[in-house]
């Protein structure tokens, strides 16, 4: 497992990801945390989520806060924050489309792991390979609290890997077959709050429990 993550945008095409450090201000982070607290305070008892390869109703969890931006103006504005857009546009260029948004909140001692996966294979309405995920940290993230891990270069050739059941208690209920050598090459994306990462939608990534 590696902790020296790529911060050079010129290496994105080869590595499949890049970190952008200290993108948001302290005021931005404070506002985001307050808005998130409001969402968590109003979490419903049940949610319909995509898990185990199908839509199903489950007990609500803070990892399943999907699509906040159409309902809450703050999250839409955060998605198009000038500095967030600067990072996103540095890779594919200025013509961007927001496909979806998702807040993943991992409570201490209870946060679910996310098994190895490729984002693109879960976005059934999305076609093409010029697709990236922007992942923004509003709390400090490290391996101890379940930061994201990426296996560099696994997007090359844009393989659509077969999904298999995890058989465990995790966010997706599905994973892909990853060799020990691939896991050894994984990089922990440890970031301070306000930093973000951009990764190719085909690159393998996941995270451990908090």
Predicted regions and their residues:
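Short, hydrophobic/aromatic alpha-helical segments in well-folded domains
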Residues: 74, 87, 134-137, 206
């Amino acid at each position: 497992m590696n902790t020296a993550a790529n911060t050079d945008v010129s290496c994105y095409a080869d590595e499949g990801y890049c970190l952008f450090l200290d993108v948001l201000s302290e005021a931005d982070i404070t506002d985001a945390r307050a808005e998130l607290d409001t969402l968590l305070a109003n979490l419903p008892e049940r949610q319909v989520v995509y898990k185990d390869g199908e839509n199903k109703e489950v007990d609500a969890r803070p990892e399943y806060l999907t699509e906040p931006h159409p309902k809450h103006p703050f999250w839409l504005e955060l998605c198009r924050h000038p500095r967030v857009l600067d990072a996103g546009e540095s890779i594919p260029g200025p013509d961007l489309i927001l496909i979806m948004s998702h807040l993943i909140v991992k409570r201490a001692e209870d946060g679910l792991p996310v098994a190895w996966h490729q984002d693109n294979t879960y976005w059934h309405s999305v076609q093409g390979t010029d697709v990236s995920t922007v992942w923004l940290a509003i709390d400090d993230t490290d391996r101890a609290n379940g930061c994201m891990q990426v296996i560099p270069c696994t997007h090359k050739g844009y393989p659509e890997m077969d999904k298999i059941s995890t058989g465990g208690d995790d966010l997706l209920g599905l994973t892909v077959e990853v060799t020990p050598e691939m896991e050894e090459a994984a990089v922990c994306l440890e970031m301070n709050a306000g930093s973000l990462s951009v990764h190719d939608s085909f690159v393998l990534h996941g995270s451990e429990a908090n």
